[in-house]
Amino acid sequence: MDFAIQAGDLGKYYGDCIVAGVFESRKLTEAAKALDEMCRGYLTKVLDQGDMDGRANTTLLLHNVPAIGSKRVLLVGLGKEEEYVEKVFLEAIRAAFKALHQTGVKDVGLCVADLIVKGRDTAWSVLQSTLLVEESVYRFDRLKSKREERQPSLQKIIFLIGDEAARAGAEQAFKQGAAIACGMNVTKDLGNLAPNICTPTYLAEQAGEMAKTYNLKLSVLEEKDMEALGMGALLAVARGSHQPAKLIVLEYHGREGIEKPVVLVGKGVTFDTGGISLKPAVDLDEMKYDMGGAASVFGTLTAVAEMKLPINVTAIIPTTENMPGGNATKPGDVVTSLSGQTIEILNTDAEGRLILCDALTYAERYNPDVVIDIATLTGACVVALGHVVSGLMGTDEPLVQELLQAGEKASDRAWQLPLGEEYQELLKSNFADMANIGGRWGGAITAACFLSRFTRKYRWAHLDIAGTAWKSGKEKGATGRPVPLLTQFLIDRAQQH
């Protein structure tokens, strides 16, 4: 998809379709008013005939509008003006692109200048629109014998802004949006692949391709390397699978010198049966998404590399399957982690924290500025927060606040949960330094408490994306989250330094 900015007179746009908004009661936005004046009230006349009343997410496509340079005009309903908020804007843009894909348009002029939501600016509107158009053309059909015959015809979006002064910010926004969308597509593709294809070995191969494309430093630890180091927790999860586990490290050096890196640690369980603590059969196929944390780290690093951000980022991806078998870890087994701490494994389905704890300890050797782990860690987080926001906890409050603010900017929000010492009591074991589960209550918090025991040498935050990494049902598929949040966090950090 190509993007461009055009400022000034809407009459100078001569493309396939121009998109403008209409509020309820047929109230035209400023851009729609300008178009209406050009065509001498034609839009008002059509609306007065009852073809559209401006209700949210409705659309009206008009052809050959008099005195308009564009071949078509698409009017998009924005609902009540006093209720026009961010959610309405995003849904309106989705509705517009859905309608456009039913046509043969190749280029579109989007009037973003007067679609701005209170508290946002033109740059935000451009960035979000860029993400939404890329989302609208995303298809995952590589595993089908016959792909969809009709592919989206849309090739170019021209953002029509009223003020030339906003051009620089808008141009930067669509470039960032295109990079983030590229990263989200990487995350979606990895998540949507079948688990017999997307194995730990496949992820290591993809890391190799990525290292070549973006000139990254790559290292991969094999099981023998992990055993030599003493990664007993990660290897305990891998024991039931015929697929060898990997620990993948990708290093992006965007800033010269000795600046400490931001380390992103992504949980990469490419299929999670639960192990001996076997999961129910219902929706078990969705456990291919249990590598959503790893996929989001791949995607975020892609976005960073596409933008050539002046920042150092290290990605650490522990990856394995969690399978039952004669050699699988049993409930009650005690293992020694890389940190030297011992863990009683009471539930083999609490495996994500086991592979993460060794990866978090391994992160120490990179002398990190901060460490953020991303994981589809707990069903408890989904119970608490649903599928709208990601769970966020951490031992460093300024870091947590940075991530919360980045999520707000990116419209990819997280919500902070407590991480009090009182919860640590729930991880006590009679036979080891700790248990890998903390009982029925506060499961998302006790999982984070477990991880915190392996992060005492640096500033750390944890994103639980179990509710946001994928969708179920008719729209089943990976979402690409939290790539926007993480990328915005890194953009902000690069600008600060």
UniProtKB/Swiss-Prot annotation:
**Binding locations of Mn(2+) 1:** 272, 349, 351
Keywords attached to this entry: Aminopeptidase, Cytoplasm, Hydrolase, Manganese, Metal-binding, Protease
Record's Gene Ontology CC terms?
Answer: cytoplasm
Q: Which Gene3D superfamilies match?
A: Leucine Aminopeptidase, subunit E, domain 1, Zn peptidases
Q: List the Pfam families hit by this protein, alphabetically.
A: Peptidase_M17, Peptidase_M17_N
In short, the EC number is 3.4.11.1, 3.4.11.10
| Top class in the EC scheme | hydrolase
Active site residues per record = 279, 353
What does the record give as the reaction this protein catalyses? Release of an N-terminal amino acid, Xaa-|-Yaa-, in which Xaa is preferably Leu, but may be other amino acids including Pro although not Arg or Lys, and Yaa may be Pro. Amino acid amides and methyl esters are also readily hydrolyzed, but rates on arylamides are exceedingly low; Release of an N-terminal amino acid, preferentially leucine, but not glutamic or aspartic acids
HAMAP family (alphabetical): Cytosol_peptidase_M17
Q: Which PANTHER family match?
A: CYTOSOL AMINOPEPTIDASE (PTHR11963:SF23), LEUCINE AMINOPEPTIDASE-RELATED (PTHR11963)
Protein purpose: Presumably involved in the processing and regular turnover of intracellular proteins. Catalyzes the removal of unsubstituted N-terminal amino acids from various peptides.
Please state what the protein is called.
Probable cytosol aminopeptidase
Organism ancestry: Bacteria, Pseudomonadati, Pseudomonadota, Betaproteobacteria, Nitrosomonadales
